[in-house]
Amino acid sequence: MVTSDKYYPYDRPPLSKEYLRGKIDRNSIFFEQPNYYTKRENIRIILNTSVEKINVKEKGVELSNGTIIHFDKALIATGGRPRKLKLPGEELEGIHYLRTLDDCDSLKQENGKEAVIIGGGFIGIEVASSLTMLGVKTTVIEVKPYIWNTFVDEKISRLIQNYFEKHGVNFILNEGVKEFIGDKRVSRVITEGGKTLNVDFALIAVGIVPNIEIAQKSGIEVDNGIIANEYLETSAKDIYVAGDVANIYDPSIGKRRRIEHWNNAEYTGKLAAKNMLGKREKYNFLSTIWSDIFDLHIESGGDTTDYDEYIIRGNFSVDNPNFNVIYLKGGVIKGYVAINRDYEELSALNKLIVSKVDVSNKKNELKDEKYDLSKLSL
């Protein structure tokens, strides 16, 4: 494994949550200690090194240190990098991105009491929760009309926003940032609408850009990521792709997409390994997305954007939210967004999405919390 990272593999989801809040220590972030890898003869990890080019015909990779490594099969799992805003003052001290362990360590060193987060997506909202719990007055600026707009619909977004506001988080919506101002260090954020916010530090969290450059330079097909077939093969023979950078046809929703979440990265990594070893197993996975913010556990599966009706199961309220919004199209469950629901219910819904069972005449059962949803797939 060749990586430009200086650390052995570690768990990224806690960076915006438990690790940022100091609930877990630095060692627990790592999947294994270094000797786990170094004592194994069949595992070699090259740190602090990038791949400059892949010679797809000769089956060789050229490293940044000039070394050439030949392969029988290769996997590209380059992920993504934080999207930059390229605004005046963005180079000032106190302006952060969050993607790596070092990014989080830098953010943890901030001791100011007022922060601005630009971006109301996953990372932005999770960090807003964490900073607020640490006693930092936090404002989220989102250019779209509502937060988490690629993940939930407006009614759920408004409920989550209200829940955050009850915990002290401020929001500026439908408005972007114009510039950052400060003398060496950021002290003010100016919005496009002319608002001025005094800040001690800021986080920019406006999504990621897939790292496709190595594929582009090597003549491998790209389009919003690196194009993969159902076996996770790229357009180049014996070269596979996995994780956030992979553009995959998702049979659960019937279209191609890149999935920027942990469980899909884990699944595609394992599937690519199987296929590189000759198993020939097709991609067949319903990716679920989850987040923990304040005392809410939010989970979603399937497609929550393409629907003709929805059913609410549970208590859809900002006071003690505990519900599941189930999205249907043509009588078939397409997806769901759930807050504080149990594993059995979500597992049953995942199976119903995959099996495409017609539940047109079972809407009362979907609403009834006492009804066991697993019976619908029998």
Predicted regions and their residues:
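A short, polar/charged loop-to-alpha-helix boundary motif
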Residues: 342-359
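FAD-site-proximal beta/loop scaffold in flavoenzymes
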Residues: 91-112, 181-190, 195-271
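Mid-to-C-terminal Rossmann-like scaffold of FAD/NAD(P)H-dependent oxidoreductases
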Residues: 245-347
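Glycine-rich dinucleotide-binding loop and its adjacent helix/turn
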Residues: 78-134
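A Rossmann-like FAD-binding core segment of flavoenzymes
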Residues: 44-65, 69, 134-228
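Cofactor-binding loop segments of dinucleotide-utilizing enzymes, especially the Rossmann-like FAD-
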Residues: 3-5, 100, 120, 143, ...
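Cysteine/selenocysteine-centered motifs that mediate thiol-based redox chemistry or coordinate metal-sulfur cofactors
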Residues: 107, 359-378
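Beta1-alpha1 glycine-rich phosphate/pyrophosphate-binding loop at the start
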Residues: 1-43, 130-152
